[in-house]
């Protein structure tokens, strides 16, 4: 009787000492101060994008011809236009808030457009290394040999400007990274004993791919998706600056930069505000990606 009670006490102590993976992840993520700051900034940006119709002080398309190129409020401006106005008299703050909706939407959608086929192609390359693998990987090598922005511009030249085409172009540019990462992770997992046991138990190909192997490859994929999200925001801003992305007068950060490039010296705020917004968003997402890597990578945990 005493032995059973002691064993139960030891088991209870072990259960209390071993936190759940979610609790362990949150604890490790919170230890990275930069990641927490990046998460806070992106929460603010996301809330601003979702609540844009209610928190934006003005219509982003409304033109006030009497207040064109009005300076920000802290430099002899007025409180009606806190961050000033652009060359058409449109409120910069309102356009930044509404532009966040477009940038985040395109970023998230392009990541999903690249993630899903990238995972499928990567798994096919890992499970069929003699047949489909070489063909898929050589195609990815050719795509990676081209500069990403040049490839995106080439795709946009074929498809034409527009929001959907910009999403497709960015997804094509980021696709090889997902394929290579999925293939590498899956090939490591294929050597594990649990995969052999699943095969001996009669698991089919699809079950092996998406039930046995894929869940164990998600950690590096999530980290890569986070970093690709920041690259997607940069790419859509670059395409908008070149006139191939979101078309005026729709508010989008890159398009705002393109329309303001003639006023860099005379009205610095027209260029500085969207530029700082892009910088803060991309930096915050990269900090979040570093935090996810530190929290999800078991090798880094062993080193620490």
Model-derived features with residue positions:
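Residue-level signal for helical boundary/lining positions with a hydrophobic bias
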Residues: 28, 55, 82-85, 263, ...
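Hydrophobic alpha-helical transmembrane segments of membrane transport/permease proteins
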Residues: 40, 48-85, 242-250
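Residue-level marker of positions within ordered structural domains that often coincide
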Residues: 34, 52, 74, 187, ...
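Alpha-helical transmembrane segments of integral membrane proteins
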Residues: 87-304
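Short acidic (Asp/Glu) and glycine-rich catalytic loops that position anionic groups and cofactors
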Residues: 1-5, 46, 238-239
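Membrane-topology segments of multi-pass transport proteins
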Residues: 1-31, 62-90, 304
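N-terminal signal-anchor/first transmembrane alpha helix
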Residues: 13-61, 139, 217-218
């Amino acid at each position: 009787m005493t032995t059973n009670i002691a064993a139960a006490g030891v088991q209870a102590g072990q259960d209390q000492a071993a936190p759940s993976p979610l609790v362990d992840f949150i604890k490790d993520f919170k230890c990275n101060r930069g990641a927490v700051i990046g998460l806070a900034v992106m929460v603010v940006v996301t809330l601003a994008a979702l609540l844009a119709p209610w928190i934006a002080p003005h219509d982003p398309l409304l033109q006030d011809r009497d207040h064109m190129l009005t300076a920000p409020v802290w430099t002899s401006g007025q409180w009606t236009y806190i961050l000033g106005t652009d060359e058409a008299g449109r409120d910069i703050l309102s356009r930044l808030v509404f532009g966040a909706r477009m940038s985040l939407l395109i970023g998230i959608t392009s990541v999903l457009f690249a993630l899903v086929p990238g995972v499928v192609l990567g798994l096919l390359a890992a499970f069929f290394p003699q047949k489909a693998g070489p063909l898929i990987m050589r195609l990815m090598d050719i795509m990676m040999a081209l500069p990403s922005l040049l490839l995106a511009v080439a795709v946009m030249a074929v498809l034409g400007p527009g929001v959907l085409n910009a999403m497709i172009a960015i997804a094509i540019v980021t696709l090889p990274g997902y394929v290579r990462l999925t293939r590498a992770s899956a090939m490591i997992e294929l050597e594990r004993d649990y995969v052999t046991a699943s095969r001996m138990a009669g698991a089919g190909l699809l079950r092996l791919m998406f039930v046995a192997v894929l869940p164990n490859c998600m950690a590096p994929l999530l980290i890569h998706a986070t970093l690709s999200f920041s690259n997607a925001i940069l790419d859509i801003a670059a395409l908008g600056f070149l006139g191939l992305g979101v078309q005026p007068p729709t508010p989008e950060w890159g398009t705002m930069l393109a329309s303001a490039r003639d006023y860099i010296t005379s009205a610095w705020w027209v260029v500085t505000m969207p530029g700082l917004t892009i910088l803060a968003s991309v930096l915050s997402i990269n900090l979040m990606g570093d935090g996810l890597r530190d929290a999800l990578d078991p090798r880094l945990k062993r080193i620490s």
